[in-house]
Amino acid sequence: MGYCSGRCTLIFICGMQLVCVLERQIFDFLGYQWAPILANFVHIIIVILGLFGTIQYRPRYITGYAVWLVLWVTWNVFVICFYLEAGDLSKETDLILTFNISMHRSWWMENGPGCTVTSVTPAPDWAPEDHRYITVSGCFLEYQYIEVAHSSLQIVLALAGFIYACYVVKCITEEEDSFDFIGGFDSYGYQGPQKTSHLQLQPMYMQIPLDNN
């Protein structure tokens, strides 16, 4: 009963991870955040494999899913540190999330709740010609906190998924071991006698009484 509930819970967690990461992937595409797009894509593939392993009782798939969750948590911790500008990181000057190929920022920077975007003209000399220079004001919630909330939710789901993945793998392994033990005992206790393929033929003699009359 506990194993069934744990397996069902892991399936639910995988489903929630897929929904949340797909929502995040859409907004990362809108903001041209190439590093998160790549990480999200890999995460989607691994979660699908973990979901398949949970449904089909494949412990190797679930183990790979659990290992990936450790890396996924590490990535989301880095994203949180980036947007909160921990250490030497700066969300305004560093272009890590776009692989340094564009100056795009998070989609939520201009489209957050209550944000008002104002174009600045003329643009500074250092601004690229294909980019507009803007100011954003009036946001109810700054974009970096929205990104931090997204990453925090992913961390919570990943930790829950890791715990239940380990539990399900443990239950599947114990169940397989018990089946192997029962099968080995039955085959040993109830194995029929072996038939030899070579039979030695012996001549048979019959004594027939003779009538002297």
UniProtKB/Swiss-Prot annotation:
A Pfam entry, by short name: NKAIN
Keyword ATP-binding attached: no
Membrane-spanning residues: 5-27, 35-55, 62-82, 153-173
Membrane topology: Multi-pass membrane protein
Keyword terms: Cell membrane, Membrane, Transmembrane, Transmembrane helix
A Gene Ontology BP annotation from the UniProt entry: regulation of sodium ion transport
Predominant localisation class: membrane
CC per GO annotation: plasma membrane
The UniProt record lists the keyword Transit peptide: no
Record's subcellular location: Cell membrane
Subunit-structure text: Interacts with ATP1B1.
Similarity annotation: Belongs to the NKAIN family.
Record's protein name: Sodium/potassium-transporting ATPase subunit beta-1-interacting protein 2
Species name: Bos taurus (Bovine)
Native organism taxonomy: Eukaryota, Metazoa, Chordata, Craniata, Vertebrata
